[in-house]
From Swiss-Prot:
Organism: Candida albicans (strain SC5314 / ATCC MYA-2876)
Sequence motif Q motif, residues: 293-322
Name of the encoding gene: PRP5
Keyword Hydrolase: yes
Domain Helicase C-terminal per the UniProt entry, residue ranges: 540-690
Upper lineage: Eukaryota, Fungi, Dikarya, Ascomycota, Saccharomycotina
Name assigned to this protein: Pre-mRNA-processing ATP-dependent RNA helicase PRP5
Length: 884
C-alpha cells in the first residue's frame, strides 16, 4: 500500500510540473502577440496620418488652383443657372402650347378624338448623382474627380467651356424633339394625302404659325369676354312667359258703384261747383263719375263702413276720396294726383277690398287677387298697416308684405298658406315670382293692381321691373296709379300700362297742403364757410327744439338731412345735448330702420325726434307729428313737397321749417316757388336771391332741374337705344325691322339694362402721355374698365391681383381716370390730354411688346374668372329653391 501511494504521489507531482510549464509558455505567446499587434497598429496609424496630410496638401493646392482659374463666385453661378432654367422653362412652355394647338388642328381635320397632350414631367432641379441616375439615364456621365492636380485642372477647364446645366438642357431638348417628331410622323401618316397638301399650302401662305396661334388665343379670350358680358347684360330674374290668349281666366266683376239719386239729380254746373269746393278737383277722361259727398253714397258692405265710422272715425271723404272712390268702384283705370296726407291710400284700399270680397277667397298657393307695388319698404309697411285696420276682424282677408332686406323664408311661408293681397317692392316681388320656377308665387288670379308713388317708382328705374310683373297679370285687370307729384314726362309712360284712364288732379301738382305753416330760415354765409354754416344751423336747431318741446311736449319732430353721415353726426350731437333722438337712412339695416320708426311712432318710447334722409319723405305716417325741419334744403320742389307733407296729415295742423344759405340760389328758387303756389308769405331777401337766379338761367349760366332726374327716368330711352345698337352689332343688323302693329299689340318682356362696353386691348408703341420723368416705357395699352360690372372691376384692381400680374409680366400697371356712372359721359373725350378726366382705365406699360401682351392676357383671364363668379351668383340668387 505504501509503495502504491508513493507512486501515485510521484505521478501527480510530475503532472503539475508539466502543467505549470505549459501555462508559462502560453502566457509568453499572448504577450508577444499583443505587443506585435500594438506595433502594427502604431505603424498603421502613422501611415494613415501621413496619407491624410498628403490628401490635405493636395486639396489645398486644388483650392488655390480653383480660386485662380474660376473668377465667377458661387452665388453668380447659381444666379446664372437659375436664369437659364427660367428661360428654358418659358421656351419649353411656349413650345408645348404651339405643339398642342398644331396637333389639335391636325386631329380635327381627321375628325378623330385622340389625346395629344404630353404628360408633364416633374423634374428636380437639384442635380444630385442619385436623382440624375434614377430619372435621366440618358444624361452624359461625368468623370468622378480624383485627388490628382492635373485631373482637377482638366475638369475645371471642361466646366468652363461647357457647363453641366447646358449639357443637361440640351439633352432634354434633343429627347423632346425626337418624341415630337415621332408623334408628328404618326399623326401625319394617319391623315389623307389631300389634307397634307392643304396643310403644306397653308404653311406656305399662312406666315408664322406662332403668331397665328397667339392671335387665335387673343381672339378666343376676346370672344369669351364679349359672350359673358352679353350674357350678363341679358341676365335677369327670368320669369316664365305667359300666353294670355291660351289661359282660361275666370270672369270677374269690376263695377260695384251705382250713383245715388241725389247725385244724379245734380246739373253739370252744380257738379263743377262741388269739385271747386273740394280743393279744385280737375278730371280728364270720358264718362267720369260725379264726386260723392258722404260715405253712404258708396253703399259699402257693413264690415268696411263700420271700420271707417267706428275705428278710423272719418266723418266724410277727403277731396281725392270723393272723386277717386266712385271712379275706381266703377271699374275704371285711374291716375290720382293729390297732396300728401290727403287720404290716397284709403282711395284704393276700399275699392280693392270690395273687389276681393266679390270673388272666391284664395286657397293654398293660388296667388293673390290684389297687388300693391311701392318704391320703398317703409311705404309698403305703412300700406300694410292701413289694410290691417280692415282685415283684423275678417280672417278671410289675408295680406302679406314682401320687401327686400328681410328674410324671404317667412314671406314664402305666408304665401304658401294663401293670401288675398300682396304689398311689396318690385324687386322682391320678382324674386318671389322667379323662385322655384314660379311655384312659390303666381299672379294668374290677380285682377286689381295698384302703383303707389308711381312717379318715384318709375323715376328710380323700376319701369322694367314693373313691366315684367305686369306681363304675368291678365290684360283685362284694373290698374290704379297714385302719387303726390306727377311730372308731364311720366304721363306717357303711365298711360302705356293703363286702359282709357281717368286722370284726377286735386289741388294742383306739387303743392303743399294749406294746413302746413311754412317757414324759411336764411343764413348769410358764403360757399367757403361751410363749417360756420353748419355750426349756425346746429345752434338754431337746438333753439327750435327747446322752444317747440316746451309748447308741445307730446308732439313728434322730424328732421331731414341730405347725407347719411350728417344724419348720424346730428343724432350724436343731439344725444350729447340731452335731446332723445334716433336716425334712419338707407345705410342702416332693415331691422334697425323698422325699429327706429316703431320707437318714433310710439307715444311711450320717450323718443320724439327722428333724423332721416329723404328715404322717410314717402309714406311715413306718424300721428301727432307736428314739426318738420329741413336741416339741409331739398334739391328740387317735388322732394320738398313730400318732406313737409309728413306733417299736417288728415286735416291736422303742421309746421315746416327749412334752413337755407344765401350761397344756395337754386334751393332758394325752389322754396320761393313752393311758397308762392301755397300762397304763403315770402321773405324779400329770398325773392331777391331767386330773381338773381332766374336772371342767370335766362343768360344760360344756370339750369333749372326738377324731379328726381338722372336716377333712371331720363335715361330710359337712351338705355333702349343702346340695347338696340348692341343687338344690331351682335346680329349684323340683318334682322328685319319690327312692325309697328306688333309693337303696339305686344308688350316687351325684356328688361332694359345699361350697355356694358367691351374693353379695347390696343397696344401702342411709344411713350405714354401720362408718364413723366426719365423712366419711360416703349409700349403701353389702355384698358377701360369703367363700364364693367362693379364686382368685376373690384376683382381686377385688387392689390393682390395687380401685383401678381405685374410680377408675372414684368410690366407697370396703374389705375387712371375716374369712375362715371352708367349713362353719364366724361367731361372731355380727349383721353390723351385729359387722362385724369377720362373714364376709369388701367394703364399697362412695358419695355417689350411681349410683356405688355402677356399682361393683357392675364387681365383678360382675370376678367373671365370674375364674370364666371358673377354669373354663378346671379344664377343662384333668383332661381334657387328656397328651403323653409
Amino acid at each position: 500500500m505504501s509503495i502504491d501511494n508513493q507512486a501515485s504521489t510521484a505521478l501527480k507531482n510530475s503532472g503539475q510540473e508539466v502543467k505549470n510549464n505549459t501555462n508559462q509558455t502560453s502566457e509568453l505567446s499572448k504577450e508577444e502577440k499583443l505587443r506585435k499587434r500594438r506595433e502594427q497598429l502604431e505603424l498603421w496609424r502613422q501611415k494613415k496620418q501621413q496619407q491624410q496630410q498628403e490628401q490635405e496638401e493636395v486639396q489645398n493646392k486644388a483650392k488655390k488652383t480653383e480660386d485662380s482659374t474660376n473668377n465667377t463666385s458661387t452665388e453668380e453661378v447659381k444666379k446664372s443657372r437659375q436664369q437659364r432654367i427660367e428661360e428654358w422653362k418659358r421656351a419649353r412652355l411656349q413650345k408645348q402650347q404651339a405643339t398642342k394647338e398644331k396637333t389639335t388642328t391636325i386631329t380635327i381635320k381627321k375628325k378623330v378624338h385622340s389625346q395629344t397632350t404630353r404628360p408633364t414631367l416633374k423634374r428636380n432641379l437639384d442635380f444630385g448623382d442619385d436623382e440624375d441616375d434614377r430619372k435621366n439615364s440618358h444624361r452624359p456621365v461625368f468623370k468622378k474627380p480624383s485627388l490628382e492636380y492635373d485631373e482637377i485642372s482638366e475638369h475645371q477647364n471642361d466646366k468652363e467651356s461647357e457647363d453641366e446645366l447646358d449639357v443637361f438642357l440640351a439633352s432634354i431638348r434633343e429627347s423632346e424633339l425626337k418624341s415630337d417628331n415621332t408623334k408628328a410622323e404618326k399623326a401625319i401618316e394617319s391623315i389623307p394625302e389631300g389634307d397634307v397638301e392643304n396643310e403644306k399650302e397653308n404653311d406656305d401662305y399662312g406666315g408664322d404659325g406662332d403668331e397665328e396661334d397667339e392671335s387665335d388665343e387673343e381672339s378666343r379670350l376676346q370672344d369669351l369676354i364679349s359672350t359673358k358680358l352679353t350674357k350678363l347684360q341679358n341676365k335677369g330674374k327670368e320669369l316664365q312667359s305667359i300666353d294670355h290668349s291660351q289661359e282660361n281666366y275666370q270672369e270677374f266683376r269690376k263695377v260695384f258703384y251705382r250713383e245715388a239719386y241725389e247725385l244724379s239729380a245734380l246739373s253739370d254746373e252744380q257738379v263743377e261747383l262741388i269739385r271747386q269746393d273740394l280743393d279744385n278737383i280737375k278730371v280728364k277722361g270720358t264718362d267720369v263719375p260725379r264726386p260723392i259727398l258722404k260715405w253712404s253714397h258708396l253703399a259699402l258692405p257693413t264690415n268696411l263702413s263700420s271700420v271707417i265710422h267706428d275705428k278710423l272715425k272719418f266723418e266724410k271723404p277727403s277731396a281725392i276720396q270723393s272723386q277717386a272712390l266712385p271712379t275706381i268702384l266703377s271699374g275704371r283705370d285711374v291716375i290720382g294726383i293729390a297732396k300728401t296726407g290727403s287720404g290716397k291710400t284709403l282711395s284704393y284700399v276700399l275699392p280693392m277690398l270690395r273687389h276681393i270680397q266679390d270673388q272666391q277667397f284664395s286657397k293654398d298657393n293660388q296667388g293673390p287677387i290684389g297687388l300693391i307695388l311701392s318704391p320703398t319698404r317703409e311705404l309698403a309697411l305703412q300700406i300694410e298697416k292701413e289694410i290691417l285696420n280692415f282685415t283684423k276682424r275678417n280672417n278671410n282677408l289675408r295680406v302679406c308684405c314682401c320687401y327686400g332686406g328681410s328674410s324671404i323664408e317667412n314671406q314664402i311661408n305666408e304665401l304658401k298658406k294663401g293670401v288675398e293681397i300682396i304689398v311689396g317692392t318690385p324687386g322682391r316681388v320678382i324674386d318671389l315670382l322667379a323662385a322655384n320656377s314660379g311655384r312659390v308665387l303666381n299672379l294668374k288670379r290677380c285682377t286689381f293692381v295698384v302703383l303707389d308713388e308711381a312717379d318715384r317708382m318709375f323715376d328710380l328705374g323700376f319701369e322694367p321691373q314693373v313691366n315684367k310683373i305686369l306681363t304675368q297679370i291678365r290684360p283685362d285687370r284694373q290698374t290704379v296709379l297714385f302719387s303726390a307729384t306727377f311730372p308731364r314726362k311720366m304721363e306717357t309712360l303711365a298711360k302705356q300700362i293703363l286702359t282709357d284712364p281717368v286722370v284726377i288732379i286735386v289741388g294742383g301738382i306739387s303743392v303743399v297742403a294749406p294746413e302746413i305753416k311754412q317757414e324759411v330760415v336764411l343764413f348769410e354765409t358764403s360757399a367757403e364757410e361751410q363749417d360756420k354754416y353748419k355750426q349756425q344751423r346746429v345752434e338754431k336747431l337746438h333753439d327750435i327744439l327747446t322752444n317747440y318741446q316746451i309748447e308741445h311736449p307730446d308732439s313728434k319732430i322730424l328732421v331731414f338731412t341730405e347725407k347719411q353721415n350728417d344724419a348720424d353726426e346730428l343724432v350724436a350731437n343731439l344725444l350729447s345735448n340731452k335731446y332723445p333722438a334716433i336716425a334712419i337712412h338707407g345705410g342702416k339695416d332693415q331691422m334697425d330702420r323698422k325699429y327706429a320708426i316703431k320707437e318714433f311712432a310710439s307715444m311711450d318710447s320717450g323718443i320724439n325726434i327722428l333724423i332721416a334722409t329723404s328715404i322717410a319723405a314717402r309714406g311715413l305716417d306718424v300721428r301727432n307729428l307736428g314739426l318738420v325741419i329741413n336741416f339741409d334744403p331739398p334739391n328740387h320742389m317735388e322732394d320738398y313737397v313730400h318732406r313737409v307733407g309728413r306733417t299736417g296729415r288728415a286735416g291736422a295742423k303742421g309746421n315746416a321749417i327749412t334752413f337755407v344759405s344765401s350761397s344756395q340760389p337754386k334751393e332758394v328758387f325752389n322754396l320761393v316757388k313752393a311758397l308762392k303756389l301755397s300762397h304763403s308769405d315770402i321773405d324779400p331777401k329770398l325773392e331777391e336771391i331767386a330773381n338773381k337766379f332766374v336772371t342767370k338761367v335766362k343768360a344760360g349760366k344756370e339750369k333749372i332741374s326738377s324731379g328726381f332726374g338722372g336716377k333712371g327716368l331720363d335715361n330710359l330711352q337712351e338705355v333702349r337705344d343702346n340695347k338696340l345698337k348692341l343687338e344690331k352689332q351682335r346680329f349684323g343688323d340683318q334682322q328685319p325691322q319690327r312692325q309697328q302693329e306688333e309693337t303696339e299689340t305686344k308688350k316687351s318682356n325684356d328688361e332694359p339694362v345699361p350697355d356694358i362696353a367691351l374693353p379695347e386691348f390696343n397696344i401702342i408703341e411709344g411713350n405714354t402721355p401720362e408718364t413723366s420723368g426719365p423712366d419711360k416705357c416703349k409700349f403701353y395699352c389702355r384698358i377701360v374698365i369703367n363700364d364693367l360690372p362693379q364686382k368685376v372691376r373690384w376683382n381686377i384692381v385688387q392689390r393682390e391681383s395687380l401685383s401678381k400680374i405685374i410680377d408675372e409680366s414684368r410690366t407697370s400697371i396703374t389705375t387712371r381716370g375716374q369712375y362715371y356712372p352708367p349713362g353719364s359721359k366724361p367731361l372731355s373725350n380727349d383721353q390723351e390730354r385729359n387722362g385724369s378726366l377720362a373714364k376709369l382705365y388701367l394703364l399697362v406699360e412695358g419695355l417689350t411688346l411681349q410683356s405688355v401682351t402677356e399682361a393683357i392676357t392675364l387681365i383678360k383671364k382675370k376678367m373671365l374668372e370674375s364674370l364666371d363668379i358673377l354669373n354663378q351668383r346671379e344664377n343662384l340668387q333668383p332661381t334657387g329653391r328656397y328651403v323653409v
